[in-house]
């Protein structure tokens, strides 16, 4: 069955891997968006012929507009953050895949849902910062929320037996452990961005690779899992699986465990989200069990990797706590990538923001953006 896809964040790591899947399945691309990568987006326009494109950076949008001028069948250009939301809301696609990085993806997720589109969600920050708003909107508009993160896709796949899903008692959320697994605080003190960007298993963008090194990514995924699957955080166990073969598992009331395994390739969860509920042949090689000599499982070190501990505190506080943790982390990672703070400062700053307020209670979309600004300002004031 052919589908039309709007892909938000098409020039990033998840975006380009999504286009691999779309190409292999012969799906039609309805819309594409990028932040500032003009040349890459132009290449995608040449191949996939979308009806709409969006460039959120206005300087880059002007360059894209000039490059598209005079082209036959050029897509309509939308610009800025409002253009991204407009693209997400347009009638036409069967699925909107949101792979925008950071809180910038929240508004687009809500617009897609409120317009009645099924949402394939790689932008975990939508649920981390606005989980209450997103899940309410999904219920109100009767759309599918399809997880693209490999771990949440694995859990989603393990829960497809709806009767068994009623007996879910625990989620086993796996983590690779990142490049610094097993190291203690003193060993981490001098780690640079070059060290942190060397992920052992996954091909990802810079921000999520740093998040993997600090274990912030796993903290965000814990929060995401609470919203997606309805279990409290104490029922979600983080397990370090160094080989990234077991992508996550679920435990039922009879203590049986069902896991999803596969090679560490993001195109598997991307494809499942786009073809759901069907399973079809894809572009990823099969897992050869005879080559697996060892699968290891370890406890995540929250004492050393404070981002994970901070995220657990944040989700237990509720309300805007996770939003504050996310905003602090986005700002701290930006500063780390600019060589303005050290690796350990990321966890210190995220935890300090979470500890600075109670954060409880209901919230609006405006509250989310205000909390995000507050968290970023806190980080800059406490360097």
Predicted feature locations:
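Catalytic, metal-anchored helix/loop core of enzyme active sites in primary metabolism
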Residues: 1-383
């Amino acid at each position: 069955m052919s589908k039309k896809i709007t892909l938000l964040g098409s020039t990033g790591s998840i975006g380009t891997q999504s286009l691999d899947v779309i190409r292999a399945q012969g799906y039609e691309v309805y819309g594409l968006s990028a932040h500032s990568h003009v040349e890459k987006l132009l290449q995608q326009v040449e191949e996939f012929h979308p009806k709409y494109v969006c460039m959120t950076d206005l300087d880059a949008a002007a360059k894209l507009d000039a490059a598209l001028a005079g082209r036959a069948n050029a897509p309509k250009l939308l610009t800025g953050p409002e253009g991204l939301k407009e693209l997400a809301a347009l009638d036409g696609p069967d699925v909107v895949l949101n792979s925008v990085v950071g809180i910038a993806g929240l508004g687009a997720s809500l617009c897609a849902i409120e317009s009645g589109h099924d949402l394939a969600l790689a932008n975990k920050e939508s649920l981390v910062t606005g989980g209450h708003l997103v899940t309410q909107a999904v219920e109100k508009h009767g759309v599918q929320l399809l997880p693209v993160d490999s771990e949440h896709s694995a859990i989603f796949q393990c829960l497809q037996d709806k009767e068994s899903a009623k007996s879910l008692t625990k989620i086993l959320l796996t983590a690779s452990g990142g490049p610094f697994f097993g190291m203690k605080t003193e060993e981490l003190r001098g780690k640079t961005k070059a060290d942190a960007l060397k992920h052992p298993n996954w091909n990802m963008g810079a921000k999520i690779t740093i998040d993997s090194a600090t274990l912030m990514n796993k903290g965000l995924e814990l929060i995401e899992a609470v919203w997606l699957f309805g279990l409290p955080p104490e029922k979600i166990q983080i397990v370090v699986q160094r080989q990234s073969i077991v992508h996550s598992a679920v435990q039922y009331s009879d203590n049986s465990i069902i896991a999803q395994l596969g090679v560490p390739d993001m195109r598997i969860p991307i494809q499942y989200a786009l073809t759901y509920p069907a399973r079809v042949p894809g572009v990823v090689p099969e897992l050869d069990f005879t080559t697996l000599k060892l699968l290891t499982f370890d406890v995540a070190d929250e004492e050393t990797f404070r981002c994970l501990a901070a995220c657990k505190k944040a989700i237990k506080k509720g309300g805007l706590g996770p939003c504050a943790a996310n905003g602090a982390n986005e700002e701290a990672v930006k500063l780390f990538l600019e060589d303005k703070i050290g690796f350990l400062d990321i966890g210190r700053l995220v935890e300090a923001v979470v500890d600075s307020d109670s954060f409880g209670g209901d919230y609006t979309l405006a509250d989310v953006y205000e909390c995000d600004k507050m968290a970023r300002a806190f980080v800059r004031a406490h360097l």
